[in-house]
């Protein structure tokens, strides 16, 4: 005997194949309503391919260089990066990663969507962040991951601090994405 089931809560992982933040909040917010306890911005634009938008940032770092072997990451086709010649692990540092900037902009769109009634009151704004290991593993040689990842982790911690400073905790949900593309 078949039974029907209507979910009471729906969780969206992050990426949503719509045209932009306003379309995500409008379409998904209206369709799922109160079943959504949190809603991501859909990771539009340069974030559409998950961590790929971090590659230019890493590639432009003076602490990294393309691996001399010419090896490519099979899944992305990007040249793998390694420590630049003469660079020690404790010298590596990264500046702004862009996640806090993107979150703050999307949060303003979230507020507008909630004010319009597209997103139900009480729904939190979900910020999806990759683990530092996911980013570094995706673009760096295995031999240098352990040397590079701590610096990226520090930069990501600063991003989280900025997100938490600019988005009220009562509106915020942070999801750590643990996977490799």
Regions found by a protein language model. Name each.
Residues 1-155, 161-172, 176:
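Alpha/beta catalytic barrel-like cores
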């Amino acid at each position: 005997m078949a039974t029907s089931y209507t979910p009471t809560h729906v969780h969206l992982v992050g990426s949503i194949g719509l045209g932009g933040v306003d379309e995500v909040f409008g379409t998904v917010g209206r369709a799922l309503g109160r079943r959504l306890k949190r809603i991501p911005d859909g990771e539009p634009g340069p974030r559409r391919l998950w961590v790929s938008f971090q590659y230019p940032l890493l590639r432009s770092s003076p602490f990294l260089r393309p691996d001399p072997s010419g090896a490519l990451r099979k899944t992305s086709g990007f040249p793998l990066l390694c420590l630049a010649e003469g660079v020690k692990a404790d010298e590596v540092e990264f500046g702004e990663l862009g996640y806090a900037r993107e979150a703050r902009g999307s949060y303003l769109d979230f507020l507008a969507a909630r004010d319009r009634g597209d997103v139900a009151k009480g729904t939190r704004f979900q910020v999806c962040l990759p683990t530092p290991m996911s980013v570094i593993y995706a673009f760096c040689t295995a031999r240098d991951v352990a040397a590079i990842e701590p610096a990226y982790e520090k930069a990501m911690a600063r991003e989280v601090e900025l997100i938490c400073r600019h988005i009220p905790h009562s509106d915020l949900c942070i999801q750590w994405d643990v996977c490799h593309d």
